[in-house]
Every structure is written in C-alpha cells, then in structure tokens.
C-alpha cells in the first residue's frame, strides 16, 4: 500500500477543484485528471485524518463499475494513460493506483440517487409521511426493508461543506429539461438494478447509491465522477441482513458511529480519528473491493 495521501500537489497541471475526496486537474482542453485522495468526510465535513488506501480502493471499484456497466451508458474513462497526462515519474508516483484520466464533460447539476431499501433519510421521511421524497410506499414497511421497486430520489449538488438537498423530478426537469431529466432517471434506475443484481450474487446488498452524469459536445449522456463505491453507496453484507435492524456497512460507518459519541457540533474543523477507527474503516473498504471485484 502506498503512503496515505491527504492532498495532491501537481505543478505540471492546473488545479481546477478540490472536493471532499477528489482533486481535479485539467489535462489540455479535452481531458481531466481525477486524483482520489485518502480524505474522509462525515456530515459534510472533511476530517483531518486520512484512511490509508481508501483512494486506491475507490478508484479500483469505480473503474470496475464503469467497465461493467458501459453497455447501459457511456462513461468518462479516456484512452489517455496517467503517464501521458503526468510525464514526470516523480510527480506521478504518489498518484499511481488512485487516478483516472477522463474526458472533460459538462456535468449536470443533479445527484441521481436511487434507493432500493428503506434506510437513512428515506426511513425518516417514510415514518413521517409514508413516502420517500414524494414517492408513495406501502404501509407497514420496516427499517431496512427492501422496497417493492427501486425508487429515484434526486438531489441538488451542494458545494463542499453544504448539504445536498432532496428535490422532486419536476425540479430536475426545470433544471435540465424534461427529456434529459427522464433519461437521467431511467439510466440511473437501470444502472442500479444491474449493479445490485451483480453485487447480491457476491454477498453485498447495495441499499442505495448516487450517480452523477455529464454530457459530451454532442449531448450524449455519460456516467461521471465515481460509480457505486462505498462512498457513494450503502453496501450491506447479505448474509447478516435482517429487516427491522440497521445493517452494518462496508464504508465509513465506523467513522460516523465514532463521531456520534463525541461532543462535536458537526461543523468544521472535524476531530482527529483514533487508530482503531481508521484500521476498521480501511479493512471495510478493502473487503468491499475484494467481494465485488476479486481484487485486493
């Protein structure tokens, strides 16, 4: 495993943006370099402690899904290698295994969330209204129940430090037009269903996930950002799944659970994480990679 990377520092390429986890660089006019760091965020706050190897795991899982699902929708992956984008070997070394060179696409201002199970904010919404983000559901469902059919519950993309806001389909139609909004919904549901079926055969339930999409110059929809990672999805072990209880996750649940024990107001700056929480979180990310792809 390489050294933990909290922040990338490239001098050969212009930095466009630092997100919660990813650093984005321009590679000419037509490509981007996505560097997935070991930063971890919780409650929309970036924490000061890295999770070693997390960036490499997220990159491998995303690349796996991009290729696995490209029959459903084109994706951002480009033919350019990392060596072509960053020719200097010393500058390139910290980026190996955690970087993707991608096409530069016009990102849509929508988080395309698909939920297959009743958990998190969806469960809270259901308890109050009998619906999830305006989608009516049968009465009598329990926490973590599988939904009769996956539902599409889009949200707006928030700036770093802000919270994404759930919106209805009509709002997304106003943002991008009804035809494109419908295509995003249909594509997100198709991606989720295909991925959930594959993952379940490997012992992982994908309870929900978040996709992002972009358009090329011809207006063709592409899957961008990350795909079905433990950061953008809830992964549960299928062998211990029981409706009525909140299942453990293959993600930063250890981080969230630890932070809930602290007297912290969930605003920046975030607290340091203890070594045992870091270790358990690292192991969970690696287990997700192994189960899904067979790689370690």
Curated annotation (Swiss-Prot):
Give this protein's Gene Ontology molecular function annotations. Answer: ATP binding; phosphoribosylaminoimidazolesuccinocarboxamide synthase activity
Give the record's GO biological process terms. Answer: 'de novo' IMP biosynthetic process
InterPro entries reported for this sequence? SAICAR_synt/ADE2_N, SAICAR_synth, SAICAR_synthetase_CS
One Gene Ontology cellular component annotation held by this UniProt entry: cytoplasm
Q: Which UniProt keywords apply?
A: ATP-binding, Ligase, Nucleotide-binding, Purine biosynthesis
The reactions it catalyses are: 5-amino-1-(5-phospho-D-ribosyl)imidazole-4-carboxylate + L-aspartate + ATP = (2S)-2-[5-amino-1-(5-phospho-beta-D-ribosyl)imidazole-4-carboxamido]succinate + ADP + phosphate + 2 H(+)
Keyword Ribonucleoprotein present in the record's keywords: the answer is: no
* UniProt pathway: Purine metabolism; IMP biosynthesis via de novo pathway; 5-amino-1-(5-phospho-D-ribosyl)imidazole-4-carboxamide from 5-amino-1-(5-phospho-D-ribosyl)imidazole-4-carboxylate: step 1/2
Q: Does the keyword Disulfide bond apply?
A: no
Enzyme kind, highest EC tier: ligase
User: One Pfam family, short name please?
Assistant: SAICAR_synt
EC number in record = 6.3.2.6
Task: Give the domain of life.
Answer: Bacteria
**UniProt record similarity statement:** Belongs to the SAICAR synthetase family.
Q: What name does the UniProt record give this protein?
A: Phosphoribosylaminoimidazole-succinocarboxamide synthase
Q: Which organism is it from?
A: Thioalkalivibrio sulfidiphilus (strain HL-EbGR7)
Lineage, highest ranks first = Bacteria, Pseudomonadati, Pseudomonadota, Gammaproteobacteria, Chromatiales
- The protein's gene is named purC
């Amino acid at each position: 495993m390489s050294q933990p990377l909290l922040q990338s520092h490239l001098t050969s390429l212009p930095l466009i943006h630092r997100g919660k986890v990813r650093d984005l660089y321009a590679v000419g006019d037509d490509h981007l370099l996505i560097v997935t760091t070991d930063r971890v965020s919780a409650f929309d706050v970036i924490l000061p402690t890295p999770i070693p190897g997390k960036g490499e795991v997220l990159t491998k899982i995303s690349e796996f899904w991009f290729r696995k699902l490209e029959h459903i929708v084109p994706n951002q992956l480009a033919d350019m290698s990392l060596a072509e984008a960053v020719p200097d070997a010393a500058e390139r070394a910290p980026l190996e295994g955690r970087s993707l060179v991608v096409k530069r696409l016009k990102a849509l201002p929508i988080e395309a969330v698909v939920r297959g199970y009743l958990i998190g904010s969806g469960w809270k919404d259901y308890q109050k209204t009998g619906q999830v983000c305006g989608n009516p559901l049968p009465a009598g469902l329990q926490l973590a129940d599988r939904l009769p059919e996956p539902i599409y519950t889009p949200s707006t993309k928030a700036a770093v430090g802000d919270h994404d806001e759930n919106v209805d389909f009509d709002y997304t139609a106003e943002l991008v037009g009804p035809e494109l909004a419908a295509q995003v919904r249909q594509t997100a549901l198709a991606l989720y269903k295909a991925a959930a079926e594959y993952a379940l055969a490997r012992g992982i339930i994908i309870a929900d996930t978040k996709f992002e999409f972009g358009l090329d110059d011809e207006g063709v929809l592409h899957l961008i950002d990350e795909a079905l990672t433990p950061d953008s999805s809830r992964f549960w072990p299928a062998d211990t799944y029981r409706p009525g209880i909140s299942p453990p996750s293959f993600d930063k649940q250890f981080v969230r659970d630890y932070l809930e024990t602290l007297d912290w107001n969930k605003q920046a700056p975030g607290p340091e994480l203890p070594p045992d929480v870091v270790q358990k979180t690292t192991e969970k990310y690696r287990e997700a990679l192994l189960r899904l792809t067979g790689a370690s």
